[in-house]
Structures are given as C-alpha cells and as structure tokens.
C-alpha cells in the first residue's frame, strides 16, 4: 500500500510539473520589453516620424472639424489574409507580435515585423497577410471623425495576394 501510494505520488508530481511547464510555457518566454527591466531613469524612444505612408506617398492634410481618435487592436491567425481595402483616414500603429506582409494593388509590398512602427496608406487599395509563424497582434491608431469608416472593403478586386 505504501509503495503504491509512493508510486502514485511520484507519477502525480511528474504530471503536475510537466503539465505546469507546458501550460506556463507562454509566460516563461522572455517579454519583448525585457530589455527595459533594469532601467533607472525615464527614457523616450522615437519609433517613427514621417509625413509619408509605408509606400512613400505623402499623407493627406488633416480632416476639418472635430477629430475622433480610435485605437484598435487586431489579432490575425497564422496564414490569415485581410480582404482588399482602403483607409479614408490617417492611421498608424505598432506590430506587437508576428509578421505582416502588406501588398498594394500596384504590387508594392512591405513586410512588418514585431516591434516595427507602420504608417498605413491613405486612399490606395491594399491588403495584408500574416506571413509569420504566430498570430499577429497589431495596435493601430486612427485620426478620424465621427461616422467615418476606418476601412472600406473592395470585394470587386479579385486579384490574388502574391
């Protein structure tokens, strides 16, 4: 009986420790911000300053009227593709995780990786795809006005993303 209990407790310990290691794996991986854990003073880092979108086009003038600021977090599964769309308003963001490939209707492409700042195209039709091996987490900031869409889809565009 004692031997059976001892074996049972040993097996239970292995299962619990193995299970815990498996379930806690994501929390054990290093934070992308671990490099800042030991700073002793406030730091400021300019991630991006531009008047152009990622494809080199000049950003439009600001809208007239009362602004509405919108912050969105997008999460894209591995291999997912966004439909062809355009943005009627200025928007920019930070890719927190993953790898995003953006393709313009004209064929221009941009690969964005975790930690990169991105300034989106305003007006031109484009699409995006998760080309990495983990889900994308993308935080985007929109400078818009109440009632304006953040994006307009173009189902009429049948061009495959290459």
Predicted feature locations:
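Bacterial N-terminal signal peptides that target proteins for export
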Residues: 1-8
């Amino acid at each position: 009986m004692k031997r059976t209990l001892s074996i049972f407790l040993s097996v239970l310990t292995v299962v619990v420790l193995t299970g815990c290691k498996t379930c806690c794996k994501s929390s054990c991986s290093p934070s992308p911000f671990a490099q800042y854990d030991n700073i002793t003073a406030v730091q400021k880092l300019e991630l991006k300053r531009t008047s152009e979108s990622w494809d080199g086009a000049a950003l439009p003038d600001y809208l007239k009227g009362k602004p509405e600021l919108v912050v969105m977090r997008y999460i894209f599964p591995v291999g997912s593709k966004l439909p062809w769309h355009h943005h009627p308003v200025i928007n920019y963001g930070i890719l927190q995780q993953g790898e995003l490939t953006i393709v313009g209707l004209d064929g221009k492409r941009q690969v964005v990786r975790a930690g990169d700042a991105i300034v989106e195209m305003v007006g031109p039709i484009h699409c995006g795809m998760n080309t990495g091996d983990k889900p994308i987490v993308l935080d985007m900031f929109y400078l818009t006005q109440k009632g304006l869409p953040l994006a307009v889809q173009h189902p009429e565009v049948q061009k495959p993303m290459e």
